[in-house]
Amino acid sequence: MKIKFLLASLFLSTALAFADAPKTGDAAPSFEGKDQDGKTIKLSDFAGKKLVLLYFYPKDFTGGCTKEACGFRDRVGELANNNVEVIGVSFDSAESHQKFIAEYKLNFPLIADTDGKVADTYGVRMGFKPMAKRVSFLIGTDGKIIHVTDTGDPEIHFNEMKAALDGLKKS
């Protein structure tokens, strides 16, 4: 019986780890996670109020991830003017996020997805590693995904999100 349970658990966790990432036009999967200060953040908190730029990244304090976080930091005012809330997500601990935020003066929350539930829900886990791929989702106030960026280049993430926002303004 224990073996059947273990096999079922392994199958389920493997399926979640390799779930497809949602695409533009899909309903964004709901999520709930704790930020660097232990505050619960839920996608539903923003429904009907704000767009959400949910960006997943591999690791605090690494070159590309720091560049990406600082890029969003430098543009968070512009994004806020467009009614966008920036939320970062990685497998790092709340303590690591607190240090990362303090070191680089980040001005948006980081979800400590230490168990990988949020990453798995969005299909962005890096294989079996406790690490997320670099993927960003722009989620509308209606809960639908407006744009997905999955390139490894952190600068492209912001530029593509900005272009998607500019496209919204024109329509």
Regions found by a protein language model. Name each.
Residues 28-29, 51-52, 133-135:
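Short loop/turn microsegments at loop-to-beta-strand junctions
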Residues 22, 35-36, 139-140:
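Short, acidic, Ser/Thr-enriched surface-loop or helix-capping motifs
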Residues 64-78:
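Typically the conserved alpha-helix immediately C-terminal to a functionally engaged Cys/Sec
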Residues 87, 97-133:
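Short, internal strand/loop/helix patches
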Residues 132-171:
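Thiol-/selenol-based redox modules, centered on thioredoxin-like
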Residues 2-30:
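N-proximal helix/coil linker or "cap" segments that precede and/or mark the start of modular domains
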Residues 46-66:
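Short active-site neighborhood of thiol/selenol oxidoreductases, capturing the structured segment around
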Residues 31-51:
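A short beta-strand-turn-helix
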